[in-house]
UniProtKB/Swiss-Prot annotation:
Subunit structure: Homodimerization via its hinge domain. Binds to DNA via its C-terminal region. Interacts, and probably forms a ternary complex, with MukE and MukF via its C-terminal region. The complex formation is stimulated by calcium or magnesium. Interacts with tubulin-related protein FtsZ.
Protein name per its UniProtKB record: Chromosome partition protein MukB
Keyword Cytoplasm: yes
Organism for this UniProt entry: Photorhabdus laumondii subsp. laumondii (strain DSM 15139 / CIP 105565 / TT01)
Pfam families the UniProt entry points to: MukB (PF04310), MukB_hinge (PF16330), SbcC_Walker_B (PF13558)
Length: 1482
């Protein structure tokens, strides 16, 4: 028999009143006796504190505080301690006779909250002789000691050999070890279990019926429904496993997706930035080198530009000076041209005016003659008109006079008188005194002849006068011509001057004829002179460019030299062009090769990465495609072997699962048909009756019953007889045993127990010898033990299966990876390294570029030399034809000479042009200049005299004519003849008057016409004279202007002036063009120099900046590389294929990954902060830190239970495999969902029956309990009506509610809750979830109602309530219930602890004085029968004859309080004489 563990002693150190006090505890009852405040409750509080050191539960109050909601602020513990370190320990001897000291170190915490610090500890292996007080204190004098702190206690125990000290940070661990060592009856897994235990201790401490316990008797007394729970687990195991698997799949998928997403995006984010910085660093280096080269080249270019600027400035200065001269010359030429053009226009005007004057002079002479003739005609017409007028007047007067004559005589007398008067007038005029009418006619002829003669003489004189007038006009004209040509000259010198002019005229004509040849000659010489000057200018420029002076005679030799040099340079330039083309073609070919290799490099790098990953994952070195194919064959072979092994393990696992399923059947029935048969026969399976046997008894009973252990116990076999014949589905052997299932025992067999076997005597002639089975399966404990072993074996096989599945998946994925590698990368994976080739080609490219640069510089120099030579040769080609000009030194003299001759010729031509016509006019009339016609006045006088004589002759002739005409009048001497004469005279007079009037009219008309014509001729003459004078004045002015102009206007002067101006204009334009070109070139050069200087400054700034960037980038890069290498992520980040991407593409890639990462890490504060910090572009190392943080985070997230790697990238691979395995397990477990609601109902019903039986057995132990009027205590167990209805429906009417249990959306628990609600609609479910309600319905304890009843006096059995019982009766009844609970806990926990451990039993009772002596005796009897220890407290000694009694007296000595303790062994025990155990405690 296993001996029960006992509490040996209780030790208090530094408690209020107890410095170091050990209470030895009695094996049954320990009584603490003493007055109020003696320390009884403090002692019990120390025991409870050591037993349950949970400050959330401890609350020590007085009995008067029972039921109070609040006590002292410190819950009664702080005030029971003294300052400093305090201890409360329990010394225990367990069933294994091991000494265990458990306890707590307590210490007050300063502060107004009055807190207490508790540290539980345990000591094992302590020698029996050593007392706890010796261990916890240290003597510092004869009568003084100090309390050891916990660390010193630990050091002291460490020095003891074989002693183990353990300090606990968790109350759960403390209680777990106490349970394993048998100190406490129940495993306290949680705070709820601790609370139950504390409530039990508290209820026993304060006594009475605890409402906290009675309300929760089901939780205290009824164990968890392991049978129903197991059945439910069988039913929902697959569901739960499926859910777990689904959750695992979901978590794994989430982890995989998270891993893959984070790894992918973080790798893209960081590696893109990493490679971008690597590329930028390389770019910075290249840029720095390029900038340095460009800086040096710019310095050289600036020096060249400065030299060019100086040369062009010098040339510009020269050209500017020449430009001023050319501008002056051009302006002078333009002015000269303008003057020549003005002179030409003036000369044209002069010529025109001279022509006009000559024409006017001719017209004037003609008009003068016309006017003179018209004057003479007018005078004649005037005389005629006057004579006609006189004749008319005379005739009119005669007619008038004739009218006055009244008679003929008178008229005749008048006529006669008139005739006489006419005769007298004729005589007077003719000076003929002897003139008579008779001889008048003779004298008329004489005088008419005389008149004729006078007229002829007048005409002669008139002709002479006309000739004289003409001679005078010619002289004047000749004289005027000479004056016009020579100027003012005397009339006497005119002849000599005219002769000289005419003498010089031929020579001047000869000179004038030479003007054009001279002008052409001069133009030719001037052109030659200009060409000579240009040639000299070219020669000077050529010498300046050559930097050496050359003479004209040296140019031909220099030309041949330059031609040879040009030919050599031309060949060199052509060869350099071909060489440069070849080099460029080579560069282009290299560039194309680099481009092709660059395009192939990422593919090759990706193939190499894949190949290296395959090599790392498989641990194989693959050097060729043959190695790859051979290894793929090996993978196929390994896959086949692993698949075969996996299938074998799967078969073993299925076999084990069948065994587990068979052993997991309810009531221990291996055949499910037995349960149905037991229900049909109204019996109970034998295995169900013996379901609670211990594992130690299982072999015996298994051998005892043999094959009948699977039989059915029925109340009456005769009632079963009728059912046997109708059985259709039953096992081959069916054992039926008659007996009462409620009180069945093994008395049905006559058996003898032997060593590891049982001999069963069925009859005298039939024995059965059954050995103990090696693996007993009879009884729940044995089955559970076997199930545990099978589960372990199944777990081992499952793990092996998972490993093999993992290996198969891994091999398959490896083969798939190899297949993908073969399909994608095998063609390029084993090619030569393109990057090495790229490096070699780039090096060659750089060398070629350098060579090409040097060659181009040489070529540029040669080209410049060739261009200079070509320009020099061009200049020489222009100079060579003009060498003779350059050597002609007399050209200027000849030009001056010809220019002088031309001036003379032009002067002669100009003189002839001006006076040629005058000379031509002068030549025929030069002779008139010899004599001056001074007799012109005398001749004019003779003419006037002759004119008067002719007029007189006319008058005389007219007078004679009149006399002749009046000759008849001389006959009117008689009066007889006067009338007839008057009539004839009248007629004649009238006729004559008419003729005279007509003559007068005609004469007037002629005179008027002549006057008009004369006036017109005079006007024409006047206008001609005016025009002549005006033109003559204008001609004088023009001559004056020509003199003022001072330019000879010949025919070619304008052409020469224009050619000269045009030449100078061209020269000036060329000069200006050159100046503009030079200015532009200088401006461009200055701009180029400025830009070069700016470029130099910028290049220097950029170079220093890029150099600083290179230096800082190098420092940062070193830090980054150090961080990368230290954390081993270089392989992940240094993705060489990214080196071939542009910076923009890498930045875009990093930005896209950044956006995805922001979403991915939004729920992770650490990664979110790291990502936010990593966004700083100036701190690239933070991106590495972020990547490391991601790796660390993912390493922490790796589920080590399913993934066997620390690398997140490898974890992704394993996750893929694990997903496939978990999915396969899910499919397999779904097939296990095969239990009905009827089975669950049967399990719950059987469990309820079993627990009812157990309660009945507990009731049997309490039936003899007696307290006061109470004669017994029992527990009533009833099934709730609503729950019983649920069981009936589950058993018999489950088909009606399959809609709930077959629903894919509802779990079995939820279906149970829905069914319960459907059956009991009146029950209010509140806010609880169907899952929670269903889980409660699967717990059999919720189907039962427990009530405590007492048998009290005449009332019989009634419900135990404090109000219906006395205090003592209530305390006793409550104690009985607590004992029942403790027993129930021990039975429930029997399978959980060691089989050689029987736990301690101890309860408390404060204020036990409320019980009478008989009740106390009952308690003592109960403790003895149940092997239970009891600590009671009372003011006075209770039953001192039994147990151990301590008398406590609290004393105060010198302000020092202590408790005086006296211990007394009970004298009624089988021990020596009463023993005094007294010890004064300081």
């Amino acid at each position: 028999m296993i001996e029960r563990g006992k509490f040996r002693s209780l030790t208090l150190v530094n408690w209020n009143g107890f410095f170091a006090r050990t209470f030895d505890l009695d094996e049954l009852v320990t009584t603490l006796s003493g007055g109020n405040g003696a320390g009884k409750s403090t002692t019990m509080a120390a025991f409870v504190t050591a037993l349950i050191p949970d400050l959330t539960l401890l609350h020590f109050r007085n009995t008067t505080e029972a039921g109070a909601t609040s006590g002292s602020r410190d819950k009664g513990l702080h005030g029971k301690l003294r300052a400093g370190v305090c201890y409360s320990t329990l010394d225990v001897i367990n069933s294994r006779h091991q000494r265990v000291v458990v306890g707590v170190r307590l210490q007050q915490v300063a502060g107004r909250d009055r807190k207490v610090d508790i540290k539980p500890f345990m000591i094992q292996g302590l020698p029996t002789a050593m007392q706890p007080t010796q261990l916890l204190t240290e003597n510092v004098g004869e009568r003084q000691a100090r309390v050891l702190p916990l660390n010193e206690l630990k050091d002291r125990l460490d020095e003891m050999e074989g002693v183990q000290f353990k300090q606990f940070n968790s109350i759960t661990d403390y209680h777990a070890l106490m349970f394993d060592l048998g100190v406490i009856p129940k495993r306290l897994r949680s705070a709820s279990d601790r609370s139950k235990f504390y409530r039990l201790i508290e209820a026993s401490l304060y006594g009475g019926i605890s409402s906290a316990i009675t309300r929760s008797l089901r939780d205290y007394l009824l164990p968890e429904n392991s049978g129903v729970r197991k059945a439910f687990q069988d039913m929902e195991a697959a569901l739960r496993e499926n859910r777990i698997t689904l959750e695992a799949i979901r978590v794994t998928q989430s982890d995989r997706d998270l891993f893959k997403h984070l790894i992918t995006e973080a790798t893209a984010y960081v590696s893109a930035d990493y490679m971008r910085h690597a590329n930028e660093r390389r770019t910075y280096l290249d840029q720095a080198l390029a900038l340095r080269g460009e800086l040096f080249g710019s310095h050289r270019q600036l020096a060249t530009e400065r030299y060019r600027h100086v040369e062009m400035a010098r040339e510009l200065e020269e050209q500017s000076g020449a430009s001023v001269d050319l501008e002056a010359d051009h302006q002078a030429a333009s002015d000269h041209l303008n003057l020549v053009q003005t002179a030409m226009r003036q000369q044209e005007k002069i010529d025109r005016y001279q022509g006009d004057l000559e024409e006017l002079s001719y017209r004037l002479e003609e008009q003068t003659e016309v006017v003179e003739e018209a004057a003479e005609l007018q005078a004649e017409y005037e005389a005629r008109a006057e004579a006609a007028e006189q004749e008319v007047d005379e005739l009119k007067s005669q007619l008038a006079d004739y009218q006055q004559a009244l008679d003929v005589q008178q008229t005749r007398a008048i006529q006669y008188q008139q005739a006489l008067q006419a005769l007298e007038r004729a005589r007077e005029l003719c000076r003929l005194p002897d003139l008579a009418a008779d001889n008048a006619e003779a004298w008329l002829e004489t005088f008419q002849a005389k008149e004729q003669q006078a007229t002829e003489s007048l005409l002669t004189l008139e002709q002479k006068l006309s000739v004289a007038d003409a001679a005078h006009s010619q002289f004047e004209r000749a004289y005027q011509l000479v004056k016009n040509m020579v100027g003012e000259i005397s009339r006497s010198e005119a002849w000599q001057s005219a002769r000289e002019l005419l003498r010089d005229w031929p020579s001047q004509q000869h000179l004038a004829d030479r003007v054009q040849p001279l002008r052409m000659r001069l133009a030719e010489l001037e052109q030659r002179l200009t060409n000579q000057q240009n040639a000299e200018f070219l020669l000077n420029e050529f010498c300046k460019r050559q930097g050496q002076q050359y003479q004209a005679e040296d140019l031909e030799g220099l030309q041949s030299e330059l031609e040879a040099r040009q030919e050599a340079l031309s060949l060199s330039v052509n060869e350099s062009g071909e060489r440069r083309m070849e080099m460029r073609q080579a560069l282009e070919q290299l560039k194309q090769k680099i481009q092709s290799l660059t395009a192939r490099a990422p593919v090759w790098l990706a193939a190499q990465d894949t190949l290296s990953q395959l090599c790392e994952q498989n641990g194989e070195a693959l050097a060729s495609s043959n190695d790859v194919t051979e290894y793929m064959q090996q993978l196929l072979e390994r896959e086949r072997e692993a698949t075969v092994e996996r299938d074998e393990v799967a078969a073993q696992k299925r076999e084990l699962e069948k065994q587990i399923e068979r052993l997991s059947q309810p009531s221990g029935a291996e055949d499910s048909r037995m349960i149905a048969l037991a229900e049909r026969f109204g019996g109970v399976l034998l295995s169900e009756i013996y379901d609670d046997i211990t594992i130690d008894d299982a072999p015996y009973f298994s051998a005892l019953y043999g094959p009948a252990r699977h039989g059915i116990v029925v109340p009456d076999l005769s009632l079963v007889r009728s059912h046997l014949e109708t059985l259709e589905d039953c096992p081959e052997d069916l054992y039926l045993i008659e007996g009462d299932p409620q009180s069945f025992d093994d008395s049905v067999f006559n058996a003898e127990e032997q060593a590891n076997a049982v001999l069963v005597k069925s009859s005298d002639r039939q024995w059965r010898y059954s050995r103990y089975p090696e693996l007993p399966l009879f009884g729940r404990a044995a089955r559970e033990n076997r199930l545990e072993a099978l589960n372990l074996e199944r777990d081992t096989l499952a793990e092996r299966y998972a490993t093999l599945s993992f290996d198969v998946q891994k091999i398959q994925r490896a083969h798939q990876a190899f297949s993908q590698f073969v399909g994608k990368h095998l063609s390029v994976a084993f090619d030569t390294d393109p990057e090495a080739e790229i490096r070699e080609l780039r090096q060659r490219h750089t060398e070629l570029e350098r060579e090409l640069s040097r060659f181009e510089e040489q070529t540029q120099q040669q080209r410049q030399q060739y261009t200079q030579a070509k320009e020099s040769l061009t200049t020489l080609n222009r100079l060579i034809p003009q060498v003779t000009l350059l050597l002609d030194e007399t050209l200027i003299d000849r030009v001056e000479e010809i220019r002088e001759e031309l001036d003379e010729a032009q002067e002669a031509a100009r003189f002839l042009q001006q006076h040629g016509s005058a000379l031509a006019k002068l030549e025929p009339m030069v002779a008139v200049l010899q004599s001056d016609p001074q007799q012109h006045e005398q001749l004019q006088q003779d003419y006037e005299t002759a004119k008067q004589s002719q007029h007189q002759a006319k008058q005389q002739a007219f007078a004679l004519v009149e006399v002749v005409q009046r000759r008849a009048h001389f006959s009117y001497s008689d009066s007889a003849g006067m009338l007839s004469e008057n009539a004839d005279l009248n007629d004649k007079l009238r006729q004559r008057l008419e003729h005279a009037e007509s003559d007068r009219s005609r004469a007037r008309e002629q005179l008027r016409q002549q006057q008009a014509q004369y006036s017109q001729f005079n006007q024409v003459l006047a206008s001609l004279k005016s025009s002549y004078e005006t033109k003559q004045d204008m001609l004088k002015e023009l001559h004056q202007e020509m003199k003022e102009i001072g330019v000879r206007a010949d025919a070619n002067a304008e052409m020469r002036a224009r050619e000269r101006r045009d030449q100078l204009h061209e020269a000036l334009s060329a000069n200006r063009s050159r100046v503009n070109q030079l200015e532009k070139q200088i401006a461009f050069c200055e701009a180029e120099m400025d830009s070069l200087q700016k470029k130099l400054r910028k290049l220097e700034r950029d170079y220093y900046q890029i150099r600083e960037q290179v230096v800082s980038a190098k420092a940062g890069w070193c830090a980054v590389m150090r961080m990368v290498k230290d954390n081993g992520v270089e392989r992940r980040l240094h993705r060489r294929e990214l080196a071939y991407m542009e910076g923009g593409a890498l930045r875009s890639m990093s930005d896209k990954a950044l956006g995805a990462l922001r979403l991915a890490v939004s729920d992770n504060e650490h990664l979110r902060d790291a990502l936010r910090l990593s966004e700083d572009p100036k701190r690239p190392e933070r991106k590495i830190q972020f990547f490391i943080a991601v790796y660390q985070h993912l390493r922490e997230r790796i589920r080590q239970d399913i993934i066997r790697t620390d690398d997140p990238v490898d974890a992704i691979e394993q996750m893929e495999i694990e997903l496939a395995r978990l999915t396969e397990e899910l499919t397999a477990r779904e097939q296990k969902l095969a239990i009905s609601s009827k089975s669950v109902a049967n399990i719950i019903r059987k469990t309820i029956q079993r627990e009812q039986n157990r309660i009945r057995m507990l009731n049997q132990g309490l039936q003899a309990v007696s307290f006061g009027q109470v004669r017994g205590v029992r527990l009533n167990v009833n099934v709730r009506e609503s729950h019983a209805l649920l069981l009936d429906v589950l058993s018999e009417q489950q088909e009606q509610h399959q809609d709930l249990f077959n629903s894919q959306r509802l779990t079995f628990s939820e279906a149970m809750a829905k069914l319960y609600q459907r059956l009991n609609p009146q029950v209010d479910m509140g806010q609880r979830l169907p899952q929670t309600i269903g889980e409660e319905l699967l717990d059999y304890r919720n189907y039962l109602e427990l009530d405590v009843e007492v048998n009290r006096g005449s009332d019989g059995w009634l419900k135990a309530e404090s109000g219906a019982l006395s205090t003592g009766e209530a305390i006793g009844t409550g104690m009985s219930i607590l004992v029942m609970v403790v027993q129930s806990w021990e039975e429930e926990s029997r399978r959980l602890r060691g089989k050689d451990i029987s736990p301690c039993r101890l309860l408390f009772l404060d204020e036990a004085a409320r019980l009478d002596a008989k009740s106390i005796a009952t308690l003592f009897e109960l403790c003895e029968r149940l092997q239970m220890q009891l600590i009671i407290a009372a003011p006075e000694n209770i039953s001192p004859e039994k147990g151990t009694t301590y008398k406590l007296v609290r004393k105060v000595f010198k302000n020092h309080e202590h408790v005086h303790v006296v211990g007394l062994r009970g004298f009624g025990q089988d021990v020596p004489a009463t023993q005094l155990i007294s010890d004064a405690t300081a």
